[in-house]
């Protein structure tokens, strides 16, 4: 049997103590590139700290003024002022707040009736942010000197991300005005407003994203997946042409343009995210990329920009982790090919050599369920964690297994350090993290295969992963659980009602149960994404209802733990309450000895980086699995 999650294990410390290991988030360089600001929770909660890129001790800036959850990125308004996002208990209705790094004084700059996301900053002049204060997520400009706000775009579909050019004259951003809902184009608009122009880069239906401007403002680093995989290229505004750097072998995305015009990008390879540099790229064909000398893992650059990545002395700011090494913040010397650590990972009482490594595996998913009309077999990649090779002792007994399903769906289970997986492995569970169809990292066709098919073949992929894990001789196939959050929570619910014979238990975290209701309750930009994923909710009403887990609640046999933050704006808590009520109508009782368990988390939304809340999640997961498996 699995050990109690409170027992001391051979890695040192109790598995639940992994939740308390100090963590940093969103390292962001100052405009001069000589300092970095980041969230760090070494004090017990997330606070802001500043550190020189040359090393030395970090200095604390905030004292409770910032949110407990460091979920949103930071930015520098000028050399002495940092911007952060502040919401109420995880509701994501962010205000944009400035904090003086010397005095700690704060000032709310932007407080819309809705959500605000800072996309980029022209230091000392203005910031560009997205807001759904109107009928859709659009771009706005806030002038730092006058305090005035003006709307820059008026699209009917959401704007995603933006980049201000070096002179503060133009803004590149992502939107879609095509009939094809999968399409994403890069637009450019004057920083004072006006009519935006669309860059003619790829084919309709492809995604084109801007990443960084060149110093003269006449070229733009971008990526496009018209040929199936995302390629990095340089758009020349003078010639209106693109020079492609990537050869299309791997998924690649741009990161930053160095002052000497070397281009840094990331490359996805078997769930690892590798930093690469293109040093000489002028010409007609693909250029040669050099992979940076870091352990195989994940360079942790977020979806939204955390400012520049090049330090004052020309180094690359590099946050990185591996399956067995927690996040490290380093400065990488692109010339010498070595790195210097700024923030060391704190492993506390744990021996990192005893953490469980991730093995990249593949399996066949060839079972087409009867509710899928056009399903086809696929090879699915996944990460396998075998605790018999790591921190858990081999007592000769088969281990219970957990299939951990990522959210998104257009993200990927990657070879970064996962405290949740290491907690499970240290507690004696085998873990599989499948990258089902719809996941990122394998090209456009694989990623889009889920569109119009939520609850269909991607769930067949997950179930096939469960059967594959159960077939390992060291796994007890009768003690298998499925866990996931957000879309992963939708998957946990769906697995339990569609494949009831496979699972002994499940945990659905901030999950989706009723798709039509979710659409009605969503923010406008999330409605647009749901339409992209599942089509028009009225024209496809029967599909939306049939693929909702709540429509099949009577088929569920295993026990489920339903966990939901009461302030979740993406998957509202009403999704959990509807499923709970449906279970009660089926005659199930709630409680530790009942047919299901139900927990609502106060002061929490769609997840949290707060240490206290993280430990609470560890305890909920560990105690439920111990009871049910």
Predicted regions and their residues:
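Conserved beta-strand scaffold positions in the cores of enzyme catalytic domains, especially
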Residues: 196, 360, 431-433, 598-600
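Active-site-proximal cap/loop segments of hydrolase catalytic domains
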Residues: 439-629
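Hydrophobic beta-strand anchors of alpha/beta hydrolase catalytic cores
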Residues: 400-404, 431
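The conserved beta1-alpha1 loop
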Residues: 405-407, 564
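Terminal disorder- and signal-encoded targeting elements
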Residues: 1-20, 512-513, 573, 618
